Design a protein with these regions (language model features):
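Accessory interaction regions appended to the cores of large information-processing enzymes
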Residues: 1-189
Length: 189
């Protein structure tokens, strides 16, 4: 996600006898960790401590299915700020559901982005076509990381980070540009 947002999640169900009630306010912001980071900053007992693990579990389960194309969410920090409970109707399940509702509402507003895999491309080509190769890498949304002479005789090296989706058919394209003299390797970054 790219923005910091606060979201409310309220799970309330009454069906004769005991109902279900869980209510949370959670702040979502970009995190620095690959996994979701969970904190609680609840004051005054508005959400009892024994429900904190249920809120965290609800968020962790929800993170497995992102709001964009259903992919898992990474680099997320979630902070439980506030909420409310009912002495009879509140349960761990109700707070787990409330957290999942807050997650769905909050992430929609938090400017989510879909990440794509990036790879490390090394291209060995004759010096005479270095400009063409660099132009082609730029056209493929690549970031040139370095260039210069290589250990392979008569060939220069261009190193770049390139989105994986842009490297399909690269072998054919490189062969055409270099008249069969270019070599490349592609590894995940």
């Amino acid at each position: 996600i790219q923005a910091k947002v606060k979201a409310e999640g309220k799970h309330k169900k009454q069906s004769g006898g005991h109902g279900q009630y869980g209510h949370v306010w959670i702040e979502f912001e970009p995190g620095s960790n690959e996994k979701m980071t969970f904190e609680e900053k609840v004051f005054g007992g508005s959400v009892p401590k024994n429900y904190f693990p249920a809120v965290e579990k609800g968020l962790r389960e929800a993170c497995e299915h992102g709001v964009l194309a259903g992919y898992p969410v990474v680099n997320l920090k979630a902070t439980l700020l506030d909420g409310s409970y009912h002495p009879v109707d509140s349960s761990e399940m109700a707070f787990k559901m409330a957290a999942a509702i807050a997650y769905k509402e909050g992430l929609k507003q938090a400017k989510p982005v879909l990440l794509e895999p990036i790879g490390y491309l090394k291209v060995y080509v004759p010096e005479s076509i270095m400009g063409d190769i660099i132009g082609d890498i730029n056209k493929r949304r690549g970031q040139i990381m370095g260039m210069g002479e290589s250990e392979k005789e008569g060939l220069n090296l261009v190193e770049a980070e390139v989105p994986m989706s842009e490297t399909f058919k690269y072998a054919t394209d490189l062969r055409s540009m270099s008249q069969g003299r270019g070599i490349f390797t592609f590894d995940f970054a």
